[in-house]
């Protein structure tokens, strides 16, 4: 993310033919400038249909404003289809702001000064530079990033990533013609769930006990319960968008979140763009029949299964096979026989083909919390000991729950039909 590669500031007028590099940079800046009004218009229309975000439109007191030149970045930490994430090395405030805003900026400045290589605290997220040559993609991705920042500023839950700063000029920051003109500053996570599950699959002995994984699932459910209470659908729940910070779960990458109409019921279906990663996408999205908050419930069932079974369902399926075998024929992952019956029943209900049959996140969080409390070794050991079971049987009983394994349904049998 070298700023020298994408010059900031006003275009320089030259006589005669412009040099190819300068001409390309000018075209990129011009394209970004032209799309600012389009982005702002799209966001205004979106907010007019979002009671929760509209009610949170006042400037949040917990988000600091920065100019891009005030932030020094380090290594590239990751990239998605439309955005990049960089580590923040330093924050050097050089523009004056109101007292309250200046205090926030100073707090982040001091935090960056005191952090060491093992305690990085902040990241910046902005668009990828390639989008400057793709006007439609740039416009859509820019609007999604601005909306994500607004959602994060309005939301407050311990299992949703925290926003600490953003571009001082809001969406107008795209007008400087650079891909990183608008950005968000977020807390830096320690790891992501997909990476941890991959490590656990390679080395099962490194996996945390079942009760701890159930605790993670309960935290994810709590974050979704909170979003759904605001009528917000996540739309892109997957293990790649779930992280860890100081041992706790964080949902992140909220760019595809949308707010459903305030007076909608759980049976109302909405035609929105089909988004998400196939393995986690609800059948109704793939089949184009409309969807609602129940789509998140289906996605959570697959995340939950992957987390608890340490197995990746439908791993060998392409999108065509997923549509035919899972969405049309109703294939689902194979449950682990040693799991409690109430957990198996809950998962089965969450991935039901009919959205209206799936439980709400309120119900799911409540049931998972109860299952988790029963699964803790202390609770089970105490119960069995009170019933005068021999210590050897107590150890066997409390260890068996976390030792269950799963045989994931793969594509081989289906392909041979």
Put a short name on every predicted segment.
Residues 162-180:
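Short beta-strand micro-motifs within the conserved protein kinase catalytic domain, predominantly
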Residues 175-192:
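Conserved short submotifs of the Hanks-type protein kinase catalytic core
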Residues 216-217:
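Activation segment signature within eukaryotic-like protein kinase domains
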Residues 228-244:
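Catalytic-loop of the protein kinase fold
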Residues 245-275:
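Activation segment/activation loop of eukaryotic-type protein kinase catalytic domains
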Residues 296:
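Conserved catalytic-loop aspartate of Hanks-type protein kinases
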